[in-house]
Structures are given as C-alpha cells and as structure tokens.
Swiss-Prot record:
It catalyses: sn-glycerol 3-phosphate + NAD(+) = dihydroxyacetone phosphate + NADH + H(+); sn-glycerol 3-phosphate + NADP(+) = dihydroxyacetone phosphate + NADPH + H(+). Coiled coil: none annotated. This is Glycerol-3-phosphate dehydrogenase [NAD(P)+]. It holds the Pfam family NAD_Gly3P_dh_C. GO terms for biological process: carbohydrate metabolic process; glycerol-3-phosphate biosynthetic process; glycerol-3-phosphate catabolic process; glycerophospholipid metabolic process; phospholipid biosynthetic process. One of its GO terms (cellular component) is cytosol. Belongs to the NAD-dependent glycerol-3-phosphate dehydrogenase family.
Amino acid sequence: MSRHWTIAVLGAGAWGTALALTMQRAGHGARLWARDQNLVREINNARSNSRYLPGVKIDPAVLATDDMAAALEGADCVLAAIPAQSLRSVLAVAGTALKAHIPVVLCAKGIERETGQLMSEAARQALPENPLAALSGPSFAADLARGLPTAVTVAAQDGALAADLAKKLSAPNLRCYSSDDLMGVELGGALKNVLAIAAGATSGAGLGASAVAAITTRGFVELRRIGAAFGARAETLMGLSGLGDLILTCNSPQSRNFAYGAALGRGERLDNLPLAEGVFTASIAARMVSERGLEAPIIETVNGMLNGGLTVHAAMQALLARPLKSE
C-alpha cells in the first residue's frame, strides 16, 4: 500500500478548502495556505470558512497558515487553488521554498489575461524545475466539501506522472482519471467559463431552456474547433474536463460564470458580484480565435456583451440571423 502524502493546498477559497478537506479524508496530511490572517484564524480556531464555504465544518486535522514556507515544508505535493490571474505571482513566492522535484497540480481554470498563457505555461515560468499537472472537471466546491461524489481529470504531459497523481489524489468521494493531454484539459476548463456566461445570460434574459440547450451544444462545437486548432484531442474535450464541465456550469447558478451571465441577462448591476474567471477569459479567447481565423460566434458574442456594449437580446438575434448551415 502506497504511503500517505503531506499535501500543501495554496489558496483557502471555496475550492482550496474543499480540496484540503478531501485530501484529509483520503488519509493525507493537509495544510492550507491563505494570505488573510483573519481567515487563517477562523479556520484554525472556529473550524469554519464562513466567507467562502459557509456551513461546512473543517476537520481539526486540516491546518491553515499564512506562512508559505511553513505550508510547503515537507510537502510531497502542492495543489495550487489560486485564481488564474494571481497564479503566477503566488507560485513565484512558493518557488523560493519549494523543492524542485515536488509536483504542483494546478487547480484553477483560466487563461492569464496579460500574456494569454494557459495556467501550465504561466506556472512553468514561475517554477521551471517542478513537475506540473492540472486538475479539472465538473466539480463544485460545496459538493466536494460535503463528501458528495465527484469525478475529475488529472493531466500532465508525462502520462506516468498523471496516473500516479490521479491515484494519490483520489478519495472516497473523488474519482480522478488521468490524461496526458494537458492542452485539452486546460483549454476545456478555461473556455467553458466563457460559454457558461453565454448560457447564464440566455437563462437570465428569460429566453428559455431550449435556447440554453442550443447555446451549450453549439458552444461545445466551438470548444472542439478551438481545441483541434491548438492540438487538443477530441476525446479529451468529450470527457470530464470538456463536455462534463460544460454541462455542469451551463446549467447551474452555483457556477460563478453562469450566475454572472444570468445577472447580465437580467440587466442587473455587476459591480457587486464576485468576478467570474470567464470575464477575464472572454477577450483573450476572442483574440485567440480571431488570430487563427476560427469560427466561434458564441465566444465572440460573449466578448461583445462584456466589452463591446452588446445587449443579450441583440446578441441572440445576431446569432439567430447567422447564415444557415449543416450541423
């Protein structure tokens, strides 16, 4: 039987906290790093994370710290549950205390706004010597934290590393599949955020379940088209990190991206909402498809709604008015 690991989880938001709880349930030692000293005190003393994961009791075995070196000391693996736009800077700090052979699993889904890089590309520049992998799939933090069944994909360019990590990170309620298609897994996780905003906007505008289904399905066509252009495998995008995640996030207000889109569709003020990762990704994704001459009208429409003043109803009319074609 393989030995248990000490796992450092960077980021004590909902996802990081849920991952730390799950790793502890799997028998690993779990340390949780957070910037916020008040949050660290709440986790360690009240055994709760009321801001990000209300109603979930945190096991006393999960220890939180705001000291990066202490979080990483003796760690066998790092789970980086940092928002995509902050990942590079946090990993640069972690790199000063992290041994070069320790694997780092990227648990954020997005594209870096300033560079247009996927998470593994940004992480590679921050941590040039560490083995890198990505964890992605249809998963809500609240479900995972409460012990509900969840399945994800763990991907790395080294298939053996991915398989080993998938085995180690699996837990009683978390089934991890492995893949060596890192590009496909990362693209699926990043682009579904944009498509979920489209689905949410359609729902929020009261355009009906049929329209949401159409947006989701045609959005998946765009995801596969973009994936093929970047070398992702079709079967990866048909799996948990592509289609699976798309189905979940395009149909649930638990998704920040869907909820953001729904508020947009209802014409509500957006400045008080938690910023969804798809807001950052939309403009980058639109640029990616434009530079490669790809057809992605839904992604371009989301970018138009977020950055070009396009209304939801005008966007839907424009999509419906596109030339008819075979499916």
